[in-house]
Amino acid sequence: MAKQLVFDESARRSLERGVNAVANAVKVTLGPRGRNVVIEKKFGSPTITKDGVTVAKEVELEDKLENIGAQLLKEVASKTNDITGDGTTTATVLGQAIVKEGLRNVAAGANPLALKRGIDKAVAVAIEEIKKLAVSVEDSEAIKKVAGISANDETVGQEIASAMDKVGKEGVITIEESKGFDTEVDVVEGMQFDKGFINPYFITNPEKMEAVLEDAYILINEKKISNLKDMLPVLEKVAQTGRPLLIIAEDVEGEALATLVVNKLRGTLNIAAVKAPGFGDRRKEMLRDIAAVTGGEVVSEDLGHKLENVGMEMLGRAARIRITKDETTIVDGKGEQAQIDARVNAIKGELDSTDSDYAREKLQERLAKLSGGVAVIRVGAATETELKEKKHRYEDALSTARSAVEEGIVAGGGTTLLRVIPAVRKAAESLTGDEATGARILIRALEEPARQIAANAGEEGSVIVNAVVGSDKARYGFNAATGEYVEDMVAAGIVDPAKVTRTALQNAASIGALILTTEAIVSDKPEKAAPAMPQGGGDMGGMGGMDF
């Protein structure tokens, strides 16, 4: 396919038009008085949302060059959302402001590369200031506030804080759709994995279709068990204690499974068997996690263990085990805390070094199962459209709460970005030429989120910004929800996670500065429409004038 090439100012202005198209649609959602955006869907009801990244993802422009600019700004929103789950609208507004101010200076003759260096240096200073202003999150009240602001709903904040209280800050919290109108929080205590009983004859409670083992031993075997002779010694030892036994293995089959079922039916031994969770290397690690929680050892050929030689000291213990057809929950395992902590620290080390989102998600699941438990928030609503929108807000609020726990909170409402301006201005004074201009571009952009929040609340943005910047109180700001100035935004509960503010600024500056240094665009040339098919003759040639 033929390509079209566009250069210089024409290329940059095309990108700017695309950036503006996305930003103008997204920024109306910013702040407590931000408006909704309705998104048409090809199938089903339209989506109504106040989430910046959802709006940004739907924007596709007809002009190919402008669409490239739109895609670049969408990347800012998506990247910010992937890392923190919030701050997408702030990032979009910052990106638009950097592009607008930057291109004005490039058109006036400034060196784009020097501007980029100045912006990068100013961003580094701003991030250090944000870290200094951050306050660590110690209690559920702060989590409630930050999650409530993200969702624009105090009830959402309350439920997220309640769930984090129950399962711990490292715990797994999942958001699901409820079949009813009400939203409820269910907490699963202990370690849960998604494998159920191998055979329904292991069920102890036919009404609930579940097997419950009290004060049970746990045999954790890495390989399949099919030979009865290998398993017989450990079965005899457990039978002498009179306690139940759970077998976790890659699989249990053949005569081994038949013997277990027969012993269960005769009442000789209260026993159940489940398949090991996960696959490959992840399965090995998950079995070691279970061993740490229960105080047992994994029977592994890699470590020189053989099933026929397993002693009672290698078996794990748990106060209660509940098994359904789909999942197994181990409550109150008897493992030593030191071993569990060692596993937790090892997983945290892997989390820091991995680049894969999928691997990170699985590691966080393992971490949560070791740390406390799993909470499920089932979101209810009257209609499907409301349910989708509400579920999305819960997901955003949860990500925001996690970010707050990670790096602390700062004053919200765009206040923190205004508070870092003096430090950036001081840094700009040490720069020269176009680098200093680049730093000043960032200073102007830092004002934009507060301006937009005020504008969406029906106030004059410049007046609000000047009033906040003019105050010598570090947390003085404007509460757009009430239209009043606040002495201490953090005390008033108007907060943002420091990680969200930092990530939004970094991503916006990254894409904004790249657009300034663009000198040419190569894109597909629009295809000419194919000529229309010629119309057929009136009398259809020699068909003899067919009559109808």
UniProtKB/Swiss-Prot annotation:
ATP binds at residues 29-32, 50, 86-90, 413, 479-481, 496. It catalyses: ATP + H2O + a folded polypeptide = ADP + phosphate + an unfolded polypeptide. Pfam families: Cpn60_TCP1. Its EC number is 5.6.1.7. Signal peptide: none annotated. GO terms for biological process: chaperone cofactor-dependent protein refolding; protein refolding; response to heat. Coiled coil: none annotated. It is an enzyme of class 5 (isomerase). GO terms for cellular component: GroEL-GroES complex. Keywords: ATP-binding, Chaperone, Cytoplasm, Isomerase, Nucleotide-binding. It is found in: Cytoplasm. GO terms for molecular function: ATP binding; ATP-dependent protein folding chaperone; isomerase activity; unfolded protein binding. It comes from the Bacteria. Forms a cylinder of 14 subunits composed of two heptameric rings stacked back-to-back. Interacts with the co-chaperonin GroES. Together with its co-chaperonin GroES, plays an essential role in assisting protein folding. The GroEL-GroES system forms a nano-cage that allows encapsulation of the non-native substrate proteins and provides a physical environment optimized to promote and accelerate protein folding. NCBIfam families: GroEL, PRK00013.1, PRK12849.1, PRK12850.1, PRK12851.1. Belongs to the chaperonin (HSP60) family. This is Chaperonin GroEL. It comes from Deinococcus radiodurans (strain ATCC 13939 / DSM 20539 / JCM 16871 / CCUG 27074 / LMG 4051 / NBRC 15346 / NCIMB 9279 / VKM B-1422 / R1). The lineage of its organism: Bacteria, Thermotogati, Deinococcota, Deinococci, Deinococcales.
